[in-house]
Amino acid sequence: MKAIIVLLMVVTSNADRICTGITSSNSPHVVKTATQGEVNVTGVIPLTTTPTKSHFANLKGTQTRGKLCPNCFNCTDLDVALGRPKCMGNTPSAKVSILHEVKPATSGCFPIMHDRTKIRQLPNLLRGYENIRLSTSNVINTETAPGGPYKVGTSGSCPNVANGNGFFNTMAWVIPKDNNKTAINPVTVEVPYICSEGEDQITVWGFHSDDKTQMERLYGDSNPQKFTSSANGVTTHYVSQIGGFPNQTEDEGLKQSGRIVVDYMVQKPGKTGTIVYQRGILLPQKVWCASGRSKVIKGSLPLIGEADCLHEKYGGLNKSKPYYTGEHAKAIGNCPIWVKTPLKLANGTKYRPPAKLLKERGFFGAIAGFLEGGWEGMIAGWHGYTSHGAHGVAVAADLKSTQEAINKITKNLNYLSELEVKNLQRLSGAMNELHDEILELDEKVDDLRADTISSQIELAVLLSNEGIINSEDEHLLALERKLKKMLGPSAVEIGNGCFETKHKCNQTCLDRIAAGTFNAGDFSLPTFDSLNITAASLNDDGLDNHTILLYYSTAASSLAVTLMIAIFIVYMVSRDNVSCSICL
């Protein structure tokens, strides 16, 4: 009788190992995070730059004003503002104005007592408007002005275009006629609004004083005179100073023993002003009509070329990064925001050294291998797959996963850009609130506000880096699920994102996995391990199947009992419950 014995023999193969993971880099960079401190990453996007000083320029896409009157040669802005005869010309519109006179220059005309009024701020006031023009008509008729009749005085120290005697076009130096040279009580003149609707009217006026002899000769009164101006609820009082002046002139012209005090008042649309005066008045004539706003920044001339940003300390800047370090100062245009320290955004993955196959001995001495670290050679992406086997090492990037990581970084960049815009708007709003003060006073930067914004931006970058680095686990987990689904029953999961395949997986195989086109059948893969069935013929020696099975089961049972007894004895000996002596 023949019996068939089925012997099951599992056919093993030299399996390859496929793992998910992240690229490695030999040149790690460092970024700061909110909770992990400094972290090495494979790439960064620098967010800050440190500018170098350059010349000032015209702001790109914006009308930029250097001098109030570009075609008025050898004239200061104060000359133009007061209407010096040789400094009359076109004053173009501008959205941005350069305060190029660190200390506003004097006027090349009659000597002015600058320290008694804010007249040096008049050019700054005009720079603060987008549109400025000098009226064609006079605001006050000198022939009918109270305290007259008058004749209009001129001076050799203020020559006109023909080099004859002249005076400022914004004022009329009214001197009583010979039959009217006598002291008068204060008289009042109304200053009407003559500009167009929507324009502010800047009215310039003043008074003249000299020594007693000249005061008596010119006005018939050598005593100090009183003057008052009032507009928009602002009232200013003056008393003239008599004598004590050395002969001098502002620039060129004839030296003078007298002085003039010049002031201005701003009249809002439709509002009138008043001036109360005695002898020596300089009555308003042509007025400035101004509208719109022009941002003012300290700088220097000439303006060369164009720039994205005008910065008080660095001049014209072209924006290459959203933030900058260095000196903090006022800036206008498409400018980076000041931050205290350099900032970098992670543009890659957390740095890992090149991967090594680590081996650990497990149960019954079996060796389990897994990868630790990052991969070298994956230049097409950040996340992907690697296989190890007889073919060596193959690496392939998963472009979709890499793109998702890049999208997250782009999202963070967009967020930081939005934060930049919001902070710029906040700064702009604060500057607008101070606009009226800025027109009259040199602007001071709010350093506390800048420090606060810098801290907010730095925190936002730290949190962004934290999110980018932490999202790696999400990408790897998604990659592992994708790989497991593609491999199906053709591989066994061995942990750490690795799978042991039941087939070879070279570079071609790995590329298809990365592309999502992997098909197990293309690599001669059976559905499961093959079984070899071997038939054995036994001679009929009187043993039937039942007898054979009985012998086998008896032997197996005896062996099992023997092993159990041996294990029990070893256990008891180890617990000192049984002693064993061997005698020879």
Curated annotation (Swiss-Prot):
Keyword Glycoprotein: yes
GO MF annotation: an example: host cell surface receptor binding
Domain of life: Viruses
Gene Ontology BP annotations: endocytosis involved in viral entry into host cell; fusion of virus membrane with host endosome membrane; fusion of virus membrane with host plasma membrane; viral budding from plasma membrane; virion attachment to host cell
Topology relative to the membrane: Single-pass type I membrane protein
Signal peptide: 1-15
Protein localization: Virion membrane; Host apical cell membrane
Transmembrane segments: 553-573
Record site: Cleavage: 361-362
Disulfide bonds, paired cysteine numbers: 19-498, 75-87, 109-158, 505-509
UniProt KW keywords: Disulfide bond, Fusion of virus membrane with host endosomal membrane, Fusion of virus membrane with host membrane, Glycoprotein, Hemagglutinin, Host cell membrane, Host membrane, Host-virus interaction, Lipoprotein, Membrane, Palmitate, Signal, Transmembrane, Transmembrane helix, Viral attachment to host cell, Viral envelope protein, Viral penetration into host cytoplasm, Virion, Virus endocytosis by host, Virus entry into host cell
Gene3D superfamilies for the chain: 3.90.20.10, 3.90.209.20, Hemagglutinin Chain A, Domain 2
InterPro entries (UniProt xref): Capsid_hemagglutn, Hemagglutn_HA1_a/b_dom_sf, Hemagglutn_influenz_A/B, Hemagglutn_influenz_B
Residues in the Extracellular compartment per record: 16-552
GO CC aspect terms: host cell plasma membrane; membrane; viral envelope; virion membrane
Extra facts: Major glycoprotein, comprises over 80% of the envelope proteins present in virus particle.
Role, per record: Binds to sialic acid-containing receptors on the cell surface, bringing about the attachment of the virus particle to the cell. Plays a major role in the determination of host range restriction and virulence. Class I viral fusion protein. Responsible for penetration of the virus into the cell cytoplasm by mediating the fusion of the membrane of the endocytosed virus particle with the endosomal membrane. Low pH in endosomes induce an irreversible conformational change in HA2, releasing the fusion hydrophobic peptide. Several trimers are required to form a competent fusion pore.
Similarity comment: Belongs to the influenza viruses hemagglutinin family.
Quaternary structure note: Homotrimer of disulfide-linked HA1-HA2.
Name of the featured protein: Hemagglutinin
Organism annotation: Influenza B virus (strain B/Lee/1940)
